[in-house]
Every structure is written in C-alpha cells, then in structure tokens.
Amino acid sequence: MIPARLHRDYKGLVLLGILLGTLWETGCTQIRYSVPEELEKGSRVGDISRDLGLEPRELAERGVRIIPRGRTQLFALNPRSGSLVTAGRIDREELCMGAIKCQLNLDILMEDKVKIYGVEVEVRDINDNAPYFRESELEIKISENAATEMRFPLPHAWDPDIGKNSLQSYELSPNTHFSLIVQNGADGSKYPELVLKRALDREEKAAHHLVLTASDGGDPVRTGTARIRVMVLDANDNAPAFAQPEYRASVPENLALGTQLLVVNATDPDEGVNAEVRYSFRSVDDKAAQVFKLDCNSGTISTIGELDHEESGFYQMEVQAMDNAGYSARAKVLITVLDVNDNAPEVVLTSLASSVPENSPRGTLIALLNVNDQDSEENGQVICFIQGNLPFKLEKSYGNYYSLVTDIVLDREQVPSYNITVTATDRGTPPLSTETHISLNVADTNDNPPVFPQASYSAYIPENNPRGVSLVSVTAHDPDCEENAQITYSLAENTIQGASLSSYVSINSDTGVLYALSSFDYEQFRDLQVKVMARDNGHPPLSSNVSLSLFVLDQNDNAPEILYPALPTDGSTSVELAPRSAEPGYLVTKVVAVDRDSGQNAWLSYRLLKASEPGLFSVGLHTGEVRTARALLDRDALKQSLVVAVQDHGQPPLSATVTLTVAVANSIPQVLADLGSLESPANSETSDLTLYLVVAVAAVSCVFLAFVILLLALRLRRWHKSRLLQASGGGLTGAPASHFVGVDGVQAFLQTYSHEVSLTTDSRRSHLIFPQPNYADMLVSQESFEKSEPLLLSGDSVFSKDGHGLIEQAPPNTDWRFSQAQRPGTSGSQNGDDTGTWPNNQFDTEMLQAMILASASEAADGSSTLGGGAGTMGLSARYGPQFTLQHVPDYRQNVYIPGSNATLTNAAGKRDGKAPAGGNGNKKKSGKKEKK
C-alpha cells in the first residue's frame, strides 16, 4: 500500500516538474531569494545578472529594470554589480503581519526582448520585537467565595515576530494564592489564565498585586510585563454565559458607516447587580478595532470604518461578557466581507515609445501595459481593446501585461500622429472600465524626394541686364518634415562658350531664386540651358532635377557699323569718282552697313544727312546706294562731300555717319590737274586771313613785351631794396640760393603764344584756336619733371587711346642743337658746350623774344621753311633748372603757317619721326585738332 502511494506521489512530482519546465520556457520564470528583515539600505539580496544569464554591464544595455508596484520601492538594481539590493527599510511585521511565510513579489522587465521575470523574495523574521501587553496594568475582581482551582483569564501578550521569535511562555510573580496556566488556541496562540490555589479572604487581604511576564524564544530573549491587581469582592458565585460559542456574519464591502452587523448575547443566573453583564472585545487586532465597534451594554457589533474586501476579506474577533463580580464568558465572532465590483481596472504604462519611425515593420512595439483589477473573481477579470479603426492591436503578454504593436506599416505623410485610446473593462455587474490615452507621433524618414510643380521652366530676360538681378524663382516641395524637408538648391555644372555656368548665373541655395552674375549680351548668346537640382537634408539625401531655359531678349544696344567705305587708318580719305557725263541715277558708290542686333533693331535705313551740293546726289533708303540725282554740270565743284547717316529701327534708334568724298571727274589724272589749278585761288582767298593773324600776333607780342618790362622793373626795384638791406645789416645771414629759377617772362610768353593754326582743304578759311592759358609759377626740376605730367604735349608724345600710358616720343634730332653762334646771349659770344643752359638774365630773355618774333614773321610769309639755320629753335613746356635745348622736343610740327601748305621741319626734313610728305598730307582736319 505504501509503495503504491509513493509511486503516485513520484508520478505527480514528475508531472509537476514538466509543467514547471514548460512555464519556464514560455517566459514565466521565477527567481527566488531569501533575506532577513531590517537590512540596511543597499544590502545585497541576490545576483540578478547571473540568474538572468547576463553580465552586469548588460543590464543597462538590455534595459533590465524593475516594474514598480505601489508607491514604495523596496528593491533596486545595482547596474555595476548586477545585484538586486534593498531600496528601503524592510519590516516583516509591517509587510506580512501575522503571516507564517512572508514573500514579496516583483517583476523584472528586459526591454530589448520584452520579457518579464518574476522574482520572489522571502523575508525571514528576526527577533526585533519584544512581547507586549496592550494594557500594562490590569485589575481583576475575585469574589471571596471563589472556589479553589477557579480560573481567571488574563490578557495575552502580543509579539509580531513568528516562530521561535514569537511569544513562547508566561510567568507569574511568586505568591501564595495564585498560579498560572497557559492555554493553547486552535491557531497556536497562548492564553494565560490565573488559577486560584488558595481560597481568598477579603478580611485577611482585600487586594493582591501580581506581575505577569511574557517571554519569546529569541536570542537574546525579549520579555514584556503587565501589572495585575486582584481585588477580592464579596460573594458572587455565577458567571455569565453566551448563548452560542461562535457568531458568524457575511456582509458586503460597500456598507455604510454605523451599520449593525450582529448582536452577541450572554446571561448571568445571578440576580440583581450580580446579574448585570458588560460586553467587550477580548482579543481583536488593530485593523478590526478600527473597523468594528461593540456596544458594551447591548452587545451590538457595528461598523465605524469602511469595509474593503481588497484590504481584508475576513475578520476574527473574541468578545467577553463580564458581570459585576468579575465572572466572564468568551465567544468568537467571525465576519466575512463580500466582494463588490467597486474598483475599476487600473492600466499602467510600463514602457512607452513617444514616437515610432514611419518605416517600422508590422508588429513594432509601441507600449507595454499592465492591467490590474483589485476586485476578485469575475469582478477582477479584465478585457482590453482599442477604440476606433486604428492600425494598432493589443497582444496578450505575460500575466496581466499587454503589448501595443503596429498592425500595418505607418506613413507619416498620410497620418502624422495618432491618439490611441485603450479601454480596460472588467466582468463585474455593472462592469467598470478605464480609458488610457496614448499620443503617438510618427517620426519622419527621408522617403520622399523634392518635387518641382513643373516639368520645366522658362524665363525671359532682356540683354544688358544689371548684375545681381533676379531672373526666375523655382520652388520644390518635399512632403517630409524638418531636416528631411529642408531643400537646398544648386546648379548643375556646365560650360557656355568655354566659360563655367557659375560665372553667368547663381542660385540662392535657400530660396531657389536665380540671379544673374553678369550682364547678358544677345549678340554673344541667345539662351541658357540650366539644370536646377533640389536636394533635401535627409540621410541619405534625396534630390530631383528640373530644366530651366533662359532666353535673352535683344535690346537696341549696337549702333550700325559701316563696312564700306571703311574708315581710313592712315589719315587719308577715300575718293569716289563720278564722271561729268554721268546721267541721273548713275551709281556712284554704295554704303554698306550692318547691325549686330536682331529684328527691327537691325533694320537699317540710309539717308543723306549733308551734302556740299544739295540735290546733286541721292541715297537709297534701304539699299544705301549713292546715285546722281541730276546730270552733272560744269559749274559743279570738283570735290563733293557727302555725309550719309545709317539708322536702325530700335527704340531709341541708333545711327552712324560716314563722310564720302566724290570727285567729279572722268579720271584720276584729271582730278590732280583740277586740284593744281585750284591752288592759287585758294591761296589768294586766305591771304586776308593771314594778314589778320600776323597783325593780331604782333599786337599781342607788344602787350606781352610791355608787361615783361614792367615786371622786370618791379623785380629790379625789389632787388635794389634787398641789396640796401644787406648793406645796412651785415650781421644778417643770407638764405641759400634756390635751385629753381624764376622765369616770369617765359611764363608769360608760353601763355601768350600757346596757340595753334589749323588749315584744312575742306574750309575756305583758316581757323585760329586759342586754348586755355596754362600758368606755372616756377620751373620744375628735372626730377619733378620725370614724375609729373607734361605741361604741353607735342605731336611726338601723346596719350594712347586708353589713356593709360604715353606713346614713345621720337628721339631729338641732333640738327636742332644750338651752335655757339645760334645760342641766345650777348652777340652769341658766351662760351659753353653744346648743351647750353636756358638764358637767365634780362638781356638774354629779350634776345629770346626777338628770335621767336622773327620766327613767327618768317612763318607768316609762307615762302620759307624753318630749318636748322640760325634763328630757329623748338619750344616745349618741359624744362628745369639745368634745361638744355637738347631736351626740347620737336615743336615745329604743331605750328601751321596760315595761307600756305608749309609746316615746320628740321634740317633733315623729318616730322614726327616720319619721312617728309607733301603739304596736303600734313594738313589737319578743321575742328578735329584737340588741345591736350
């Protein structure tokens, strides 16, 4: 029989082991530790990392943490050591009052695997509490006729500890009338009773004082005492008795305060005062004493506190009935608190992700919920669901845990955020529910490239635009957000006519506005093909391109260019021949012009602007052909000048002119013969003008000479006064001689005779041009001359076209150096080398003026050419203290003799460093000579 029972027990153990192994594999892992109570904070409970199969450093990496329960956390994880430690005071009596075994349960969550481990911590009792009596002093009344061996119940002691640390024994102080016995209750409690061993005699002793000591079994032993005063009363030999030894009641937890639960009743066979009974609680714990009240006269038990099934579902109390003689009786009261569905489910978010990437796969964990209901049975059974049609679902996890996961792949561009409502409902009547709201943001990922609203763009810009002007704005849209939607614009690299595209246009990387970096020229290129790229700032970045066409619009910025007749480069003028026998409409020549513009800006029209003989020639409006308008007559001049204007049709119109010289003759030799016959009349016509010029020059010279004489007289007077001062004050120190020589006379001379005569073949009269006077206070030194600008520029040294430098001057001709006989002075008797200095006394100045006037007179008659003979010299504005005539440039080239074709040349016949030419080749055009 016994082996069969052992076989069945062994089989049950095997099945239990298999079941426990299965639960372990499914995640319901239980870890057990045992610790004594009252440990210091931070004391080690167990090596949780080892029991989880992890290294201590992996606790933080895997998100291992304790799921909190309640407000007070008793344990914590030490991430360094991987141990479970105490986080506060652990008092077994406070946590597990009266329980034989005190176990604390906690849950540990491993977030990376979403796995929960259960941990049981057994709190071992220590002897930290001494036995105590609720009443330290007790008074017992005993009738004097009480029989021996009569027992009187005494208050029992309380010890919160358990086992051997709990209450073990009672001891009564030595006396002659009483002894102590201990009764063991059904629950293991010990109840002391006072036993009368010797009959009492009130007349012998009315009161007895005893000491009751309660001891536990701890090491060391702890004790508690109570003082007992025994009062001997007059005889009363009947004790009260309860109608039943035990009272039971079952009440719901939602009773109102003051509700009567039950009534206990005890009777005493005595009569009168000895039959009066009073009720009281004999044995009741602290929680029951706060909830229930016993009426001492009626025996009615009612509520004075709220009943809560979740806090305590059962109460056990002991009541006693005592008469006036001290006789008493005891009875038990058992009250069961029935559960009522008065607690709604509680939902605790143990793990919550505030956002989830939009490209997360299905089943991505959003939150971990712990659902609890403090009610029992059906009132504590909870179901959870999500309200609305949302792409999420709840999955049952370990115990009361639910996992909120995604049901589809989310798209932020469609729905950027969700408000999730999780409803937990119990099965009670009526059912109670709790709603938990979860706000979830869908994090953006860079899954959308920028998009241009148009497939291509076109823009038109007129040429000659200012630099920096905005051309066009392109804008792309990115449905992503934040950095993924921040767009940067750029231009694709390209070359235009060998130059980089970036030298023509640029784009604002933030706004997409295209700017012109240079002024566009329609004649250079007419369109630009640009590729604009929009790139976002996501990771990885996405981009898109769009084509942009820039069309340059033509402006009328180019004047017509005359191709024929071409402008001469050597100063000569082309001559067209028109035979005198030409009929009306005869084609003399054709003006050919082009315009670099396009459209109507390049439409050209020709017209005759000016003609020396009006009505003789006509110009084709659109062809530019110069034709005779009538027959040529003998009275028509040999030379005909035509000014033809070419104009485009732009707004505003631009034009160009060309001067044509038409010779009315049948051949070139006839042209030359006719020009020779016309020379004498021309000279006769200009003789009057030459006479007027000579008279004007003589008058100006006389005025200048008078001014010089007056100036010299004043300076001589000043010099004479200074000599007198020097003679009278010999102690005065003289100032050193200046390095600069005053040339007031020469200054006046340069001012007076700074003019030029221009004679052209186009005019019947010669023109005398007087430029603005050029003043100078003193002659500058040779060093300052080399650094400063020249006062007068001759034909040998002129500014270049761009104005940045000077054209090199032809070297001075040695034939222009003065010989000893030619050098100004007193009769030419002064000695010196060939590089004589500038005259520096009054006599030499007068001689210089006379020579200049003589030269002017010789030039006026037109019969001689100034050469290298005596009395000729060249002048220039560049001179200094050590100036010599060798440095004087050839000035004769700027002097034209009125009434003749002669110009000043040197002895070798050179002019401007070129070979001598005919008189007509050296003539200047009227109005074209500009004073530099």
Curated annotation (Swiss-Prot):
Keyword ATP-binding: no
Domain of life: Eukaryota
Cysteine pairs bridged by disulfides in the record: none
Keyword flag Iron: no
Polar residues bias: start-end ranges: 816-841
Keywords: Calcium, Cell adhesion, Cell membrane, Glycoprotein, Membrane, Repeat, Signal, Transmembrane, Transmembrane helix
UniProt GO MF annotations: calcium ion binding
Cytoplasmic side: 714-932
Basic residues bias spans: 922-932
GO CC annotations, alphabetized: plasma membrane
Residue ranges annotated as Extracellular topological domain: 30-692
Residues covered by region (Disordered): 803-841, 902-932
InterPro entries the UniProt entry points to: Cadherin-like_dom (IPR002126), Cadherin-like_sf (IPR015919), Cadherin_C (IPR032455), Cadherin_CBD (IPR031904), Cadherin_CS (IPR020894), Cadherin_N (IPR013164), Protocadherin/Cadherin-CA (IPR050174)
Annotated signal sequence range: 1-29
PANTHER family assigned to the protein according to its UniProt record, in alphabetical order: CADHERIN-87A, PROTOCADHERIN GAMMA-A12
Protein name: Protocadherin gamma-A12
Gene: PCDHGA12
